[in-house]
Structures are given as C-alpha cells and as structure tokens.
Design a protein with these regions (language model features):
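Extreme N-terminal basic, low-complexity initiation segments
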Residues: 1-18
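Short hydrophobic alpha-helical segments enriched in small aliphatic residues
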Residues: 15, 22, 27-29
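Non-catalytic pre-domain segments flanking phosphatase-related domains
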Residues: 26-30, 34-64
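N-terminal helical cap/lid subdomain that shapes the substrate entry/recognition surface
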Residues: 51, 56-146, 150, 154, ...
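Conserved Lys-Pro-Asp/Glu-containing loop-to-beta segment of HAD-superfamily phosphomonoesterases
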Residues: 61, 197-225
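Substrate-recognition/cap helix-loop segment adjacent to the acidic, metal-dependent catalytic center
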Residues: 86-88, 109-116, 137, 145, ...
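Structural recognition of alpha->loop->beta junctions
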Residues: 177-185, 247-269
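Acidic, Mg2+-coordinating phosphoryl-transfer loop and its flanking beta/alpha structural elements
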Residues: 217-257
Length: 271
C-alpha cells in the first residue's frame, strides 16, 4: 500500500481539508511550490482518500537519489569507511553502519564523530579508497533499469541528485549504463561546499530550467524528503534503501509517499 501522510509545508492545510472531507479543489488550487500541488491535495482534487492507496498524476520530472534508491552501494561505502578509520587509528562505531553512514555527506559523518584534527585525513583516506575500489562494490536494485527506460519512454524527464561527489556519481551511472537516461546528474562538489541535499537539489534544479508543473523526488532517507520540501517538491520514499530508521517516528515521514517495492513505485510514478 502507498500511504500519503499529509505534512511538512502543508500539514495544517491538508489536515483541515481531510477533517472536513472536502471533495473539491477550492482549498488546494493555490498550493505553493514549484508549480505543483502536494500529493495529499492532489488526491483530494481527484476525489481520493489521502490516507489510503493513492495513484497520483504522472510526474513530468523525477529526480532520483542514488545510494539506497537506484544502487545497493552499502558494502563499498562501509568498506571504505572502515579503511579510512583504520588509516587514522580510530575505532569503528558499533551498530548497523549502512543505516548510519550511507546517504548523508561523508565529510559531515566524519566531522560528527569528533575526530578533531584527524577528520580531514579520514575524509582524504575515504575518498582515495572509495574512488579506487569502493565505488565498484555496488549493484543496481532489481527493476531499476526497466523502470528508468519506461519512464523515459513515457516522456518523463529524469535527473539524479545525490550527496555523493558528482564525478563519482557520474562514474557509477556510466558503469551501469544509465547515464543516457538522465538529463542532469547533480552531486556534491569535491571540495564539500555543496553537499547538503537541499543544496544539491538547488544545483540540479538550476540546470533543469524551465521546470514542469509536476516534479517529484525519489529517495530513501529523511534528508531526501527534507531537501525536496525545501524546494516545494513532493517526495516518494523507497523501502529497500538504508533509511528505515529515519521514519520510525511518523512525524519524520510527513509529506512523503512510502513504497515498499518497485511495483509500488511504478504505480506512484504512473508507469
């Protein structure tokens, strides 16, 4: 089931609409954002129940996250992360490393570990190892290739926005033969000045002008949802990535559509 949880930039407005059970467009016609209505309000415009299964109008532009959304990259990232900490003599954190480190900008992760003056050395060691071997310890999630091909065939514009360094993201997509599907591949700058998801999305959107009415972000983590919301874009969260813990609290997933399988993602995207 694809569940819409009304929230973020229109939480109060859509909650009021749901409470009154309004089935017309009056309260949703002027929804702010990049020329698009929220999925919750769009469901109301189509006389659908926003708390049930929703098949939204097909988006005209879909922006995908990379790690945990298109590719299963955790093993390579974790391996290079362990290597980097070993190089500076730091202990590896316990717990599920994939859920802790895959997705957010890596230099933010190292800085948050309290490595002090060794943080830069750890980042350099990580990048050296990842760009040499870690990037290739990677695979496409099942069904991604055909999904992208079908979206393109339907006339949907496609892009990637990832907190991974942009040259590495381009290399990975080229390795899997996916580069031609994407109009824009936007990633973090190598110097780290552009790394937060909202900033990477801004970089992508600037290259995608003029933007169509219906724009959608597809990712696996909370920062994908929050980065999209910063630009007035709705989000779909895939359940096969590394961010399940991000959404344990219902409030963290507000405003997003959650899908568990490629088949559900296809329904959400109209293909």
């Amino acid at each position: 089931m694809i569940t819409v949880i009304a929230g973020l930039r229109e939480r109060d407005r859509c909650a009021r609409i749901q409470t009154r059970h309004i089935s017309n467009s009056n309260d949703c016609a002027s929804t702010p954002g990049i020329g698009t209505r929220s999925l919750a309000c769009r469901a109301i415009l189509d006389n659908r129940n926003v708390t049930g299964t929703v098949s939204a109008a097909q988006p005209q532009l879909v922006i995908f996250d990379l790690d945990g959304t298109l590719t299963d990259s955790a093993d390579g990232i974790v391996s290079s992360f362990r290597h980097a900490l070993g190089q500076i003599g730091a202990a590896v954190p316990g717990g599920d490393l994939a859920s802790q480190i895959v997705g957010p900008p890596m230099h933010h992760t190292f800085e948050a570990m309290g490595l002090g003056e060794h943080a830069e050395a750890a980042i350099a060691a990580y990048r050296a190892d990842y760009t040499t071997r870690g990037w290739a310890i990677n695979s496409l999630f099942d069904g991604i290739g055909p999904l992208l091909a079908d979206l393109r065939a339907a006339g949907v514009r496609l892009a990637v926005a990832t907190s991974k360094a942009e040259p590495t993201a381009q290399r990975i997509l080229s390795h899997f033969g996916l580069n031609d599907h994407f109009e824009v591949v936007a990633g973090a700058s190598v110097d780290g000045t552009r790394a937060a998801k909202a900033d990477v999305l801004a970089h992508a959107l600037a290259q995608l002008q003029p933007l169509p009415e219906r724009v959608l972000m597809v990712g696996d983590r909370r920062h994908d949802v929050e980065g999209a919301a910063a630009h007035g874009i709705d989000a779909v969260v895939v359940g096969w990535g590394y961010g399940q813990g991000d959404f344990a609290d219902t409030g963290a997933s507000s405003g997003a559509v959650h899908v568990a399988t490629i088949a559900e993602l296809r329904r959400a995207l109209g293909v």
